[in-house]
Amino acid sequence: MKADLRRFFTGRLDEMARLARELVEMESPTTVKFTVDRLVERVAEELAACGADMIIHPREEVGDIIEARWHTDQPGAPLLLLCH
């Protein structure tokens, strides 16, 4: 399995670097809601392409929050990933 993961990610290095650069260049200061929301929309596109079930939690004064889940019908403990 470890080798499979290595091949999977190694084969996508250019794509991952491109996406990381795009997201960083979007400039989304925490205090500027519309820029954070624009970033949330872009990240949501990527998550949807990966098969995530999503809920966007609207916020009035700060950027919206994405809650993304995969395989919720499968057994096993969930994994929590928080990003800022």
Task: Go through the PLM ranges and name each one.
Residues 2-84:
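Acidic/His- and Gly-rich active-site-bordering loop/insert found
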